């Protein structure tokens, strides 16, 4: 069991470094998919096969493939990106050091007084399935954080739609209020065209 744990953990670390250090964006996404697959392996070792399946279906099957298609469709100029990074190398290094120091501080000092065996923790038994156990915890002890997470995702989705929704000139749109306000008098027009001359252009209000 420990051999597989160290194997998956090592592969996740290597693939994560390759995601950051790879010069090709497509290769970075492929390494990211490989990291997700190894993460699913760790979930299986923990006995959470449902989470492993969700990690494969959602992250690999949807998110990572979406990233891959977007990167392949966009014209990515890596040399230009490297030039921009070199211009801000000092600032980027300073921010990276601050974040690294923050993570080390949280790991060393932030978890010192935390009791990981709380009232919420429970022992997985064979009486209920893994999916039922996760659902029971999510909708009882963690109901409020779970609903808040869904609300945050909903707000983010609405914000993305609002930012990308632009009114373009020259494009015809339906005005439902104006269409419903029409009646027989301003929709039906009776004409008596002259023979072999046709009807002139009619402008509707």
Curated annotation (Swiss-Prot):
InterPro entries: NADH_UbQ/plastoQ_OxRdtase_su6 (IPR001457), Nuo/plastoQ_OxRdtase_6_NuoJ (IPR042106). One of its GO terms (molecular function) is quinone binding. It is a multi-pass membrane protein. It is found in: Cell membrane. The keyword Ribonucleoprotein does not apply. Its EC number is 7.1.1.-. Its main location: membrane. Keywords: Cell membrane, Membrane, NAD, Quinone, Translocase, Transmembrane, Transmembrane helix. The keyword Secreted does not apply. GO terms for cellular component: plasma membrane. It catalyses: a quinone + NADH + 5 H(+)(in) = a quinol + NAD(+) + 4 H(+)(out). The chain crosses the membrane at residues 1-21, 26-46, 54-74, 89-109, 142-162. NDH-1 shuttles electrons from NADH, via FMN and iron-sulfur (Fe-S) centers, to quinones in the respiratory chain. Couples the redox reaction to proton translocation (for every two electrons transferred, four hydrogen ions are translocated across the cytoplasmic membrane), and thus conserves the redox energy in a proton gradient. Belongs to the complex I subunit 6 family. This is NADH-quinone oxidoreductase subunit J. It comes from Rickettsia felis (strain ATCC VR-1525 / URRWXCal2) (Rickettsia azadi). The lineage of its organism: Bacteria, Pseudomonadati, Pseudomonadota, Alphaproteobacteria, Rickettsiales. The gene is nuoJ.
């Amino acid at each position: 069991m420990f051999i597989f744990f160290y194997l998956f953990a090592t592969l996740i670390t290597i693939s994560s470094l390759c995601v950051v250090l790879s010069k090709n964006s497509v290769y970075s996404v492929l390494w990211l998919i490989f990291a997700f697959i190894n993460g699913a392996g760790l979930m299986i070792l923990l006995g959470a096969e449902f989470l492993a399946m969700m990690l494969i279906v959602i992250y690999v099957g949807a998110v990572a493939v979406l990233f891959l298609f977007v990167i392949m469709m966009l014209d990515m100029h890596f040399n230009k990106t490297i030039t921009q990074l070199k211009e801000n190398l000092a600032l980027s290094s300073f921010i990276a050091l601050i974040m690294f120091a923050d993570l080390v501080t949280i790991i060393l000092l932030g978890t010192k007084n935390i009791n990981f065996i709380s009232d919420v923790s429970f022992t997985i038994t064979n009486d209920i399935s893994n999916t039922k156990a996760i659902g029971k915890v999510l909708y009882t002890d963690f109901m409020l954080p779970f609903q808040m997470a869904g609300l945050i995702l909903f707000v983010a989705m609405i914000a993305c739609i609002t930012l990308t929704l632009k009114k373009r000139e020259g494009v015809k749109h339906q005005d439902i209020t104006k269409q419903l306000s029409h009646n027989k008098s301003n929709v039906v027009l009776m004409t008596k065209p002259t023979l072999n001359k046709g009807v002139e252009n009619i402008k509707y209000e």
